[in-house]
UniProtKB/Swiss-Prot annotation:
Organism: Pectobacterium atrosepticum (strain SCRI 1043 / ATCC BAA-672)
Role, per record: Necessary for the introduction of cis unsaturation into fatty acids. Catalyzes the dehydration of (3R)-3-hydroxydecanoyl-ACP to E-(2)-decenoyl-ACP and then its isomerization to Z-(3)-decenoyl-ACP. Can catalyze the dehydratase reaction for beta-hydroxyacyl-ACPs with saturated chain lengths up to 16:0, being most active on intermediate chain length.
Recorded GO CC terms: cytoplasm
Subunit relationships: Homodimer.
Gene transcribed to yield this protein: fabA
Predominant place of localization: cytoplasm
Protein name in UniProt: 3-hydroxydecanoyl-[acyl-carrier-protein] dehydratase
Sorted UniProt keywords: Cytoplasm, Fatty acid biosynthesis, Fatty acid metabolism, Isomerase, Lipid biosynthesis, Lipid metabolism, Lyase
Superkingdom as given in the UniProt entry: Bacteria
């Protein structure tokens, strides 16, 4: 039985990274440092811009986060690819929440637009994922649009985020 709540704590997300939240066959989130969210604040099966599912998650920002120390020295900024990866992570998490089984793999993205950045002075990053389609056949796949906000300001968007679940990812 899938643990299908509307919100999840950091402890829940860490359980997902160990394969304990959605069962042994369900998709896992990555472990820290690559886990790019601290909590999921809302999940619905029929919400979002397209009425086909919605996820909202948050990451608390502190100046001592690992990426600020190396990207870039003297000009610290969160790499945009980490925000993109967070959106893929959330698409896979949603597929597990729906009961999908397999190992999650990012399959692509249509277009990504950056219009801002995450600096060490920021307090919170918010991710919003709007599902366009979920395919639940031999291949389980989610297709969604996503947006990233920092302290309430929209800073980037991605369309056509695609994540698939694979029973055997060795041949992927």
């Amino acid at each position: 039985m899938v643990d299908k709540r509307e919100s999840y704590t950091k402890e829940d997300l860490l359980a997902s990274s160990r394969g304990e939240l959605f069962g042994p066959q369900g998709p896992q989130l990555p472990a820290p440092n690559m886990l790019m969210m601290d909590r999921v604040v809302k999940m619905t099966e029929d919400g979002g811009k397209y009425g086909k599912g919605f996820v909202e998650a948050e990451l608390d920002i502190t100046p001592d986060q690992w990426f600020f120390g190396c990207h870039f020295i003297g000009d610290p900024v969160m790499p945009g690819c980490l925000g993109l990866d967070a959106m893929w992570q959330l698409v896979g998490f949603y597929l597990g929440w729906l009961g999908g089984e397999g190992k999650g793999r990012a399959l692509g993205v249509g277009e990504v637009k950056f219009s801002g950045q995450v600096l060490p002075t920021a307090k919170k990053v918010t991710y919003r994922i709007h599902f366009k389609r979920v395919i639940n056949r031999r291949l389980v796949m989610g297709i969604a649009d996503g947006e990233v906000l920092v302290d309430g300001q929209h800073i980037y968007a991605a369309d056509e985020l695609k994540v698939g679940l694979f029973k055997d990812a060795s041949s992927f």
